[in-house]
Amino acid sequence: MTQNIITVKKEHIIENVISKSRFIAHIKPVQNEDEAKAFIAAIKKEHKDATHNCSAYTIGPEMNIQKANDDGEPTGTAGVPMLDILKKLDVHNACVVVTRYFGGIKLGGGGLIRAYSGAVRDVIYDIGRVELREAVPCIVTLNYDQTGKFEYKLASTHFMLRNQTYTDKVSYYIDVVKSDYEAFINFLNQMTAGNFDLTEETPKQLPFDIPTE
């Protein structure tokens, strides 16, 4: 069975200003260490005039690979605190780079730790996390007179509506976690008295939103 993992929704950037220093946090989901290294290199190239480009990443369902780099900041004040936030929020397969433009005021060790870890926490909170779960992409096609009740009830379930299209009928693109598939079929039967068309695609790892606490 494929293990579910948590990562970030997509690439994202936020900026914090602390004591006149700019801390720009860039985060991206990655599949392997090569992708992480390429992302770090791209950010360093984009911000080659920055004072520091500190980085951290985790790879694998068990975070088998964990790397952190202070990029010239005092040892333990940037990369490791950044990595600690990834681990605390259980974010796998993600790379984060925090770019610092020094503003002339020294923050001290504690201040740096708070600034770098805070930037990582903020960028994750801002974009949000997803859980990659093995799911079945489904297309459910209904007559127009069935849609009102169906949509109302669907909104109160955990089945993930991705899209819907309208022709002579209405098609709903819904992702269903494999373990919930039988319950989904029961739901369809209850809502339509068995009057529906269903197309199933090959199961795959799909993202489902989860709260960031």
Question: Model-found features: residue ranges?
Answer:
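A common structural junction motif
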Residues: H47-A50, T157-L161, Q190-D197
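Terminal, non-globular segments
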Residues: I174-A183
